[in-house]
């Protein structure tokens, strides 16, 4: 229809002139955006093609991201840059660069990025592992470091050794209970050392609840899953907002985190005072040292420090032991060589102890190779850069999320030839070579794991006890063939080998009898 010589467009249809103006406006904004960001980007590390405005948001992988970053390292080099909706992400694929930045420049690389789902909403940033660098971080770390120092951990050797023996005996008696035996015995070590609590069994709420907390932690840290991490303003939505299920999820997780940590801490405090908790333990030691000077703030710091030891030690140690078993199934020659060393050094009259560690270089090499072959945390929990920095002429802006790709560092074929093979011999029995691996596996700078000496003792005694007493052999399938599991693993902050099934066959009846005799603490 025409009116006064003009053509009227149907309702809701933009005219060509309107479309032209919109297109020009968009292109102008795009050009201005590119000009505004180009100067900064040209001196930053290289990285994959980035789209205007959204950057690399759609390219950041949610499944096994360390493998993608490892492939990108072949194209872009040892340090690469990603842009997620304006958030700079620096991925480091080189151990040398990671040490230079995160260790030597730790004063500006020790922050944590602002994690909305895990921190603001779920409350996980109260734990040391996500705590911003500052006074509270230093206080919690001091509590842990004092009780789990090289000298202090010796008083916990008997706990670790007894649990290792119960674990192996439990798997011998019930081959289908491998994972549950690993879980309950590692949890029993940590609960006794941290709180003085003796675990009652696999369904004890003092361990089932912490495992649930760790599941929530891993879920909250998964990149790209929570829209609120990309659009932080969404955290202010009312709880009843349609579609904002993340708010309800975070509320449940937060309550579970706080009530679980208070439950185990308050039990430890009361039981240490009335003499029913096993002492020494971390909480009792700190409270005794602070006698008369305990403030509510210090007590809360202790609660979260203890919770960090519990949470940080559960899944990582479980992952490492499962990876060790997988390696023994796939590389039986390594298992036999390790057993020869134990037999020669320890003999058959007793079980190995943590104090034997200096005399067992091949066993130490096996443990180190497990850390390298399947690191429990392949992509280090991100650091945050608190000031602008320059490395080898490359600009690294303040506020960047810094992600050390530990997987790539430990699978770099130029440093570790044939990286997918399990070869303890690659260290030549030298602790100096093994340290290069453990230094990467346990974190960087001021964020390095304060309980690594304790963790290494736990892993060593379990590995040595398994090798001394049992042959770890594949299960037999319905066709009578050995069923050797593939090297597959989950995704997430902490990863686990999948479908690890085996049989623990006692090497001698004497070995079984020794386990029975020694498994009671």
Swiss-Prot record:
UniProt name for this protein: Cytochrome P450 monooxygenase 105
UniProt main location, coarse: membrane
Encoding gene per record: CYP105
Glycan attachment residues as annotated in the record: 218, 274, 317
Pathway the protein takes part in: Secondary metabolite biosynthesis
Family, per entry: Belongs to the cytochrome P450 family.
InterPro entries to which the protein is assigned, alphabetical: Cyt_P450 (IPR001128), Cyt_P450_CS (IPR017972), Cyt_P450_E_grp-I (IPR002401), Cyt_P450_sf (IPR036396), Cytochrome_P450_fung (IPR050364)
EC number(s) per entry: 1.-.-.-
One Gene Ontology term, aspect cellular component: membrane
PANTHER family in the cross-refs: P450, PUTATIVE (EUROFUNG)-RELATED, P450, PUTATIVE (EUROFUNG)-RELATED-RELATED
An annotated Gene Ontology molecular function: iron ion binding
Location relative to the cell: Membrane
Residue numbers binding heme: 449
CDD domains linked to this entry: CYP64-like
Function as written in the Swiss-Prot or TrEMBL entry: Cytochrome P450 monooxygenase that is able to use anthracene, carbazole, pyrene, phenanthrene and trans-stilbene as substrates for oxidation. These multifunctional properties against a series of polycyclic aromatic hydrocarbons (PAHs) suggest that CYP105 would play important roles, at least in part, in fungal metabolic systems involved in xenobiotic detoxification.
């Amino acid at each position: 229809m025409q009116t006064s010589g003009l053509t009227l467009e149907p309702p809701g249809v933009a005219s060509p002139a309107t479309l032209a103006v919109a297109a020009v406006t968009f292109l102008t904004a795009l050009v201005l955006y590119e000009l505004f960001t180009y100067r900064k980007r040209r001196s930053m590390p290289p990285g994959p093609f980035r789209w205007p405005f959204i950057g690399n948001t759609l390219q950041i992988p949610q499944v096994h991201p360390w493998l993608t970053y490892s492939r990108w390292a072949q194209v872009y080099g040892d340090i690469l840059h990603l842009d997620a909706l304006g958030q700079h992400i620096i991925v480091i694929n080189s151990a040398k660069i990671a040490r230079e930045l995160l260790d030597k420049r730790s004063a500006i690389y020790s922050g944590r990025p602002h994690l909305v789902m895990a921190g603001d909403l779920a409350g996980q940033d109260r734990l040391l592992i996500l705590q911003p660098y500052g006074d509270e971080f230093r206080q919690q770390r001091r509590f842990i470091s004092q009780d789990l120092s090289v000298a202090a951990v010796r008083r916990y050797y008997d706990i670790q050794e007894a649990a290792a023996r119960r674990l192996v005996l439990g798997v011998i008696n019930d081959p289908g209970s491998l994972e549950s035996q690993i879980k309950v015995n590692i949890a029993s070590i940590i609960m006794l050392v941290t709180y003085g609590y003796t675990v009652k069994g696999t369904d004890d709420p003092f361990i089932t609840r912490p495992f649930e907390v760790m599941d929530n932690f891993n879920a909250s840290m998964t990149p790209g899953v929570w829209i609120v991490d990309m659009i932080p303003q969404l955290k202010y939505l009312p709880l009843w907002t349609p579609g904002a299920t993340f708010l309800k999820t975070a509320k449940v997780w937060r309550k579970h985190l706080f009530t679980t940590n208070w439950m185990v801490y308050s039990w430890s405090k009361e039981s240490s005072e009335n003499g029913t908790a096993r002492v020494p333990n971390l909480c009792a030691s700190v409270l005794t040292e602070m006698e008369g000077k305990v403030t509510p703030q210090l007590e809360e710091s202790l609660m979260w420090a203890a919770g960090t030891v519990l949470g940080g030690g559960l899944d990582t140690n479980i992952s490492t032991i499962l990876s060790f078993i997988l390696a023994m199934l796939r590389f039986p020659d390594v298992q036999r060589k390790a057993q020869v060393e134990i037999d020669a050094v320890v003999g058959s009259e007793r079980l190995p102890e943590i104090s034997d560690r200096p005399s067992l270089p091949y066993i130490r090499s096996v443990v180190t190779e497990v850390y390298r072959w399947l690191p429990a945390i392949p992509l280090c929990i991100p650091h945050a850069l608190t000031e602008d920095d320059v490395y080898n002429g490359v600009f690294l802006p303040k506020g960047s999320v810094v992600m050390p790709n530990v997987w790539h560092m430990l699978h770099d074929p130029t440093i570790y030839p044939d990286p997918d093979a399990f070869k303890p011999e690659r260290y030549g029995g030298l602790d100096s070579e093994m340290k290069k691996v453990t230094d990467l596996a346990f974190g960087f700078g001021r964020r390095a794991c304060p309980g690594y000496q304790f963790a290494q003792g736990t892993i060593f005694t379990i590995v040595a006890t398994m090798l001394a007493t049992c042959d770890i052999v594949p299960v037999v399938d319905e066709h009578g063939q050995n069923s050797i599991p593939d090297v597959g693993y989950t995704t997430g902050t902490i990863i686990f080998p999948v479908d690890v099934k085996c049989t623990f066959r006692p090497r001698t009846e004497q070995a079984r009898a020794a386990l029975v005799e020694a498994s009671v603490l």
